């Protein structure tokens, strides 16, 4: 029975954070949406931050799963990295909770929201880094600093998907894949 209540609380909190953002969500509101007493929430979660963190931990697992599902062993390394990165950023771009959190961060800059965004970025970087390490071990890519390479790849993707769209028409998936191959996989050398 208590697992059902915890699930109700998590669903209600997710709904509240998605609709109202982190700052405007209160434990009273979550209790009302979950149809439980406020005290029931505190039997599972110490505070709003812990509840928020649990929701985002689950969201990060979903994001990783989407990236894993996008990859196919028969494809070349760079194509799989592109597919995984695109899946991660598309998830981030279309998931209503992440949209709200990034919006709140831009408008208010709440500390808890900034921490969750940093956690999300670290998680994405760790995931990409592990794929780069796998690529180095398999000989698919030449030895490089996996952490730095993951950072560059992520920032390139963010720039192409989010920043470019601020002043230009959105790039399609194939164009982004081609640019990733040009700048990261092949490098800028003419050889």
Swiss-Prot record:
Q: Could you tell me which Gene3D superfamilies the record lists for this protein? A: Tetracycline Repressor, domain 2 (1.10.357.10)
Q: Which residues bind DNA?
A: 26-45
Q: Which residues form the HTH tetR-type domain?
A: 3-63
- InterPro entries, A to Z: DNA-bd_HTH_TetR-type_CS, Homeodomain-like_sf, HTH-type_Tx_Regulator, HTH_TetR, KstR2_TetR_C, Tet_transcr_reg_TetR-rel_C_sf
Q: Which GO terms describe its molecular function?
A: DNA binding
Enumerate the UniProt keywords alphabetically.
DNA-binding, Repressor, Transcription, Transcription regulation
- Give the Pfam families listed for this entry: TetR_C_24, TetR_N
Q: Which protein are we looking at?
A: Uncharacterized HTH-type transcriptional regulator YhgD
Q: Which organism is it from?
A: Bacillus subtilis (strain 168)
This protein's gene is called yhgD
């Amino acid at each position: 029975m208590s697992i059902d209540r915890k699930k109700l609380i998590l669903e209600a909190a997710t709904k509240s954070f998605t609709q109202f953002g982190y700052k405007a969500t209160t434990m009273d509101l979550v209790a009302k949406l979950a149809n439980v007493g406020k005290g029931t929430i505190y039997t599972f979660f110490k505070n709003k931050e812990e509840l928020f963190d649990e929701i985002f931990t689950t969201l990060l697992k979903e994001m990783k799963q989407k990236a894993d599902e996008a990859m196919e062993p028969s494809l070349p390394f760079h194509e799989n990295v592109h597919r995984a990165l695109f899946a991660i950023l598309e998830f981030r771009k279309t998931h209503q909770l992440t949209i709200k959190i990034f919006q709140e961060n831009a408008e208010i800059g709440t500390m808890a929201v900034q921490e969750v965004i940093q956690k999300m970025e670290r998680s994405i970087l760790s995931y990409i880094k592990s794929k780069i390490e796998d690529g180095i071990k398999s000989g698919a890519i030449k030895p490089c600093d996996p952490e730095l390479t993951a950072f560059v790849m992520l920032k390139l993707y963010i720039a192409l998907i989010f920043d470019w769209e601020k002043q230009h028409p959105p790039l399609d998936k194939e164009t982004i894949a081609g640019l990733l191959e040009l700048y990261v996989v092949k490098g800028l050398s003419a050889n």
